């Protein structure tokens, strides 16, 4: 029985503990040829010739960081018929005869180095050539049901470019095949769709000098738990919540910009009040938790003392949001999953906040909640709980038909806004909302008229608007005009295009 090769402890490019071994399963053949090239040797290079018999000479590329960690004794184990080459020597005329053998633990632990090497190998001369005869295009990772993709697709067409949907799970080889048909002016990824954990897709775009825009709609550090490489710091990042700009830059992100959500085009086409039963109701639309909540936060502990502090702050009209939990727990935001513990605190606090507000509201006014079934386990029976509604279905008519729409902003986004902050007004509805610094994108004299900090203020606000219908109509008209002229997805995309100097 063969002994399992010993593992050598190392530090990954992120400074995390890892290990490498010479196990046979650690090597995969990417391409066959007459001249073998090892993309990483592993800790026992003397074994490789026996593992790949039939060749007289071998070439290899090694990651400088791993080479340094393995030290001089490792170099002495490299057979004399192994010749080191640099990635710059991977040019098309040389690669035709080469057989590439990838040492996979090297890729896993040092992805920034190896994804660039792999991109050089995968990109054929056809992919490197430009296509001047093709119309300017934009790649969008996702499908017609993906978050914001329908809105982005539609508006890109209106701006004179050709949107092309790319399957997020296409893989680097398929991506290169797509690129051979034509290179886009830009790649857009919403919430890191299509951005694999090691950065193989990004390295391909980077090699072709194609800018990649990462639009992080949700909490960026929650999204980044899926990535195992720093490649995201080299993309152009857009965040809907400007609180995250400073911490993202602290991790080395070179370009981070504030790009809020906006109104979806379909909501401007709302047909008006077609649900008269809602005209005297306050309506809340939203889930009790985001999909996949349990698995995402499954390993997170609770912090009862901090949760008690958070409840006290809620009673004082303050927001114990993600920023507050970050200060109190002071755990690393990235890499790793500890950030989820701070998010879990914000998630639990946010649910309590929604429960408090909806219960207080239901004591005085008729309330309808459109959401998931779990609300029935959380809210009192006098609240009318209706099933979730399709975003592209009856939601616009619910917004326009209701007496008012209540928004309660997610605690995961300290300065965040929701889609409702824009869509409700576009549909000729009326919104009241808890106050966050995200409202600073609107004129403050308008934002003050619709926002509250504490449940008591929420009730006073509704009372005032019910007494003064002319004021309510005036606010509604001003917000509709504001959203239509300054807060559409077309304008958000124009911001991206102008920043990156992309023309239709």
Language-model segments: which ranges?
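Alpha-helix C-terminal capping/helix-to-coil transition sites in glycosyltransferase folds
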Residues: 32, 183, 233, 400-401
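N-terminal donor/sugar-recognition subdomains of glycan-related enzymes
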Residues: 1-137, 144-151, 155, 159-163
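Short, well-ordered beta-strand core segments
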Residues: 36, 187, 212, 236-237, ...
């Amino acid at each position: 029985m063969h002994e399992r090769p010993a593992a050598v402890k190392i530090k990954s490019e992120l400074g995390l503990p890892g290990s490498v071994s010479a196990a046979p399963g650690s090597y995969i053949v990417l391409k066959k040829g007459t001249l073998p090239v090892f993309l990483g040797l592993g800790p026992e290079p003397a074994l490789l010739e026996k593992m790949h018999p039939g060749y007289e000479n071998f070439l290899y590329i090694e990651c400088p960081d791993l080479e340094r960690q393995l030290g001089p004794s490792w170099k002495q184990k490299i057979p004399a018929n192994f010749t080191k080459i640099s990635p710059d020597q991977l040019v098309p005329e040389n690669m035709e005869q080469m057989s590439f053998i990838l040492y996979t633990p090297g890729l896993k632990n040092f992805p920034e180095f190896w994804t660039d090497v792999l991109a050089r190998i995968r990109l054929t001369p056809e992919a490197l050539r430009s296509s001047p005869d093709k119309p300017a295009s934009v790649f969008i990772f996702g499908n017609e049901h993906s978050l914001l993709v329908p809105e982005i697709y539609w508006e890109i067409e209106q701006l004179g470019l050709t949107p092309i949907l790319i399957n997020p799970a296409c893989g680097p080889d398929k991506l290169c095949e797509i690129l051979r048909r034509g290179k886009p002016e830009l790649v857009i990824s919403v919430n890191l769709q299509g951005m694999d954990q090691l950065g193989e897709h990004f390295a391909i775009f980077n090699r072709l000098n194609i800018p990649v825009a990462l639009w992080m709609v949700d909490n960026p550090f929650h999204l980044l738990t899926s990535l195992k490489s720093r490649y995201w710091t080299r993309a152009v990042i857009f965040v809907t919540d400007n609180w995250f700009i400073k911490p993202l830059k602290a991790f080395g992100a070179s370009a981070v910009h504030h790009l809020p959500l906006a109104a979806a085009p379909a909501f401007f086409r709302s047909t008006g009040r077609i649900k008269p039963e809602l005209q005297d109701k306050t309506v809340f639309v939203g889930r009790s938790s985001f999909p996949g909540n349990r698995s995402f936060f499954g390993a997170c502990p609770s912090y009862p003392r901090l949760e008690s502090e958070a409840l006290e702050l809620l009673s004082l009209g303050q927001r114990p949001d993600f920023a507050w939990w970050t200060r109190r727990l002071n755990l690393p935001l990235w890499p790793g999953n500890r950030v989820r513990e701070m998010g879990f605190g914000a998630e639990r606090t946010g649910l309590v906040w929604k429960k408090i507000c909806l219960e207080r509201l239901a004591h005085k006014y008729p309330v309808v909640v459109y959401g998931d079934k779990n609300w029935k386990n959380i809210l009192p029976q006098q609240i009318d709980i209706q099933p979730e509604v399709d975003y592209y279905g009856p939601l616009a008519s619910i917004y326009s038909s209701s007496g008012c729409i209540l928004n309660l902003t997610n605690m995961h986004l300290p300065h965040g806004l929701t889609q409702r902050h824009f869509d409700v007004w576009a549909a000729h509805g009326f919104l009241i909302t808890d106050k966050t610094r995200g409202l600073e994108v609107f004129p403050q004299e308008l934002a003050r008229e619709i926002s509250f900090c504490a449940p008591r203020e929420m009730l006073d606000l509704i009372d005032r608007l019910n007494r003064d219908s002319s004021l309510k109509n005036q606010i509604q008209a001003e917000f509709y005009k504001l959203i239509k002229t300054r807060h559409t997805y077309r304008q958000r995309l124009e911001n991206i295009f102008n920043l990156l100097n992309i023309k239709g």
